[in-house]
A protein has these predicted regions:
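Short, structured segments at the rim of ligand-binding sites
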Residues: 1-419
Length: 419
């Protein structure tokens, strides 16, 4: 186990290059199953979720080469279709391998996937889509079995623009005969990145980013080299930290378009925003202003993965803010920890009503999930005294080295091993 010790009272200043995207890397690693050869991914983040995904790939028979610059995956000799409970139970992104293994072998077996405890994240849309592609789905206990003798392209209208369901359908269908159409598809930048990689391998995918994606099945894919986009949530987290500490931080290597709704909220909170090429700079005011209403939504709406961090910022903003979670029903656990620091937050159904306070006090708090840990770090940076965040190991799932990054900006933060 590990704890983070965060010292408050420092304004963050400086610039950072942002790591590769976690949410783009994981489905891309799964996509390497499909080409029966070599996939080389540059700018792949050194985080525990990627580590675990690569371990799953090794267990399936892939050869992995990893350097500080790239990850190389050779799937030419893989022959296993059964995903071990050891990895799948703790990592939800293992679900992407369902579509990839079905696309390559026509069968897959895995336990229900895990991940952060932030509410129900059912995969019924994934399984229903597979059944429309002539795939047999059987759920026995806590294990899922899928198989097909002849996968076929088909039409899908998602009741919700799920990123995972969209990506799984894409992975399963690129080698399926015929045409597959996904209506109400997810528009996230990470979905676009997956499609760009697959097209570079020889897939025939159109419409990514529009909400209506069409995939024309091809017979084979080939080797590819790809460079990952930077992580928009990591970038937004550091910009939020700048806002919270009356700081001045520039993040580099990111597209402002991917951060549009976050930047709009930060501007409403009184921040100065400067965009130049692939650089975004946020200058925080002496006192943040409240935001009357924020709703989380799928892209291009405000990202649920930034809800906790913005809640932390608003805990010291002048006035009353309302933050409504529409994506996950149980993502307010961090509010209870912020209240231990003196925050005034009331949860009403799916809305957090945040009354800004004059100051937060450093104390001992507990991390519950990845983004909640980042939120507690931001709160610690704002607080008087030191904040100790226990169970902070979650942060390694999405941030390469948050301590080193924040220290570059002038923060006082360190990790301490416990137990």
């Amino acid at each position: 186990m590990a704890s983070l010790i965060v010292g408050g009272g420092e304004s963050l200043r400086g610039s950072l290059w942002i790591q590769g995207s976690k949410n783009a890397a994981l489905p891309m690693i799964a996509a390497a199953v499909l080409n029966r050869g070599i996939t080389k991914i540059y700018h792949c983040p050194a985080i525990s979720d990627v580590d675990n995904m690569l371990e799953i790939m090794k267990s399936l028979g892939c050869c992995i080469e990893r350097t500080g610059e790239y990850v190389l995956i050779d799937s030419s000799q893989m022959d296993v279709r059964d995903i071990s409970p050891e990895y799948a139970a703790s990592m939800r992104s293992s679900v992407f391998l369902m579509g990839a293994l079905l696309g390559r072998f026509g069968e897959v077996s895995l336990p229900y996937p895990g991940g952060c405890v932030i509410g129900k994240r059912p995969i019924d849309m994934h399984l229903a889509a597979f059944e429309r592609m002539n795939i047999r789905v059987q759920v026995t206990g806590d294990r899922i079995f899928c198989s097909t003798d002849h996968m076929a392209g088909s039409g899908h209208r998602l009741r919700y623009p799920s990123v995972g369901a969209t990506e799984n359908i894409i992975l399963a269908s690129v080698l399926a005969p015929g045409q597959t159409v996904i209506k109400n598809a997810a528009k996230e930048p990470e979905v676009i990145e997956l499609c760009l990689l697959l097209n570079k391998m020889g897939a025939d995918i159109h419409g990514m980013g529009t909400g209506n994606i069409t995939i024309y099945g091809v017979s084979t894919l080939h080797d590819a080299v790809f460079s990952l986009v930077s992580d928009r949530i990591v970038a937004a987290t550091y910009l939020a930290a700048a806002a919270a500490t009356a700081g001045d931080v520039e993040v580099r290597g990111v597209w402002a378009h991917d951060l549009k709704t976050v930047l709009q909220v930060l501007a409403e909170m009184g921040c100065g925003i400067i965009v130049r090429n692939k650089r975004v700079r946020v200058i925080g005011p002496y006192m943040l202003s409240c935001v009357d209403s924020i709703y989380t939504h799928p892209f291009p709406g405000f990202p649920t993965d930034m809800q906790s961090q913005i809640m932390a910022c608003l805990s010291r903003a002048r006035g009353i803010s309302r933050l409504t979670e529409t994506v996950f029903e149980d993502r307010f656990k961090t509010a209870g920890e912020l209240k231990k620091m003196g925050a005034d937050i009331l949860i009403e159904n799916h809305t957090a009503v945040i009354r800004g306070v004059e100051c937060l006090k450093g104390t001992c708090v507990k991390a519950w999930d990845l983004r909640g840990t980042a939120a507690l770090v931001i709160a610690g940076l704002m607080a008087e005294g030191d904040t100790v965040i226990s169970d902070s190991i979650y942060i390694r799932r999405g941030y390469e080295d948050i301590c080193a990054d924040l220290k570059k900006l002038g923060a006082r933060i360190e990790e301490r091993k416990t137990g």
